[in-house]
A protein has these predicted regions:
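Conserved oxyanion/phosphate-binding beta-strand-loop segments in alpha/beta enzyme cores
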Residues: 1-50
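Conserved alpha/beta enzyme-core scaffolds, especially Rossmann-like or related mixed alpha/beta domains
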Residues: 11, 44-60, 79-86
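Flexible loop/turn segments at secondary-structure boundaries
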Residues: 18-20, 65, 88-97
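Short linear interaction motifs
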Residues: 49-56, 65, 152-157
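Conserved phosphate/anionic-ligand binding catalytic regions in large, soluble enzymes, centered on
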Residues: 62-72
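Glycine-rich phosphate/pyrophosphate-binding loops
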Residues: 70-72, 76-94
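Extended, Lys/Arg-enriched charged tracts that mediate electrostatic binding to polyanionic substrates
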Residues: 91-168
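Conserved small/polar residues in nucleotide/adenosyl-binding loops
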Residues: 169-173
């Protein structure tokens, strides 16, 4: 669809409850059975490999699942589209009840890396937090806003493929 220069959908969400990628991608590419059989011939159990993959801790609950389903549908239908969200290094968080109180802890889902994502440092952007805004005017009278005394981080994007079901298309989260 790139050569036709279509309109593009950018689906933005604070969370995407994706689920595990390996099995889902193999199913969507109609390759699950073949890969499972090929691995079995080598004495490898695909289910054991699948169990090693943590859930991407990019969301929880119904809205995160809905966002992931929208991406899956867009990829399956072949729409030119992207998912845009936050890659939480330590996940949203894990919740436990201890001694009658809710306790939150980080979800270190990236401790062993993520083979399904591609780091894109060439597109890194500075993101500024806090500080104050000073207004300046240039010689033509045009207003310019200058942010001062801020904290900044470098936001590095990661591409994460969302494979469409039996469609030979994918989109990027």
């Amino acid at each position: 669809y790139e050569k036709d220069d279509p309109k593009t959908v950018y689906y933005m969400s604070m969370e995407f409850l994706l689920g595990r990628a390996l099995g889902n991608n193999l199913i969507n590419m109609t390759a699950y059975k073949e890969v499972k059989e090929a691995l079995e011939e080598m004495g490898i159990d695909l289910n054991v490999i699948e169990d090693q993959e943590p859930d991407p801790a990019l969301g929880n609950g119904g809205l995160g699942r809905l966002a992931a389903c929208f991406l899956d549908s867009l990829a399956t239908l072949g729409y030119a589209s992207y998912g845009c969200g936050i890659r939480y290094r330590y996940g949203m968080f894990k919740q436990k009840i201890r001694d009658g109180y809710q306790v939150e802890a980080p979800d270190n889902w990236l401790k062993d890396g993520n083979p399904f994502e591609l780091r894109r440092p060439e597109y890194a952007k500075e993101v500024r937090f806090g500080g104050n805004i000073r207004v300046e005017y240039d010689e033509t009278g045009k207003t310019h806003f200058v942010q001062e005394n801020y904290e900044s981080v470098m936001a590095i994007p990661y591409d994460y493929p969302i494979v469409g079901s039996v469609s030979y298309t994918h989109l990027t989260l």
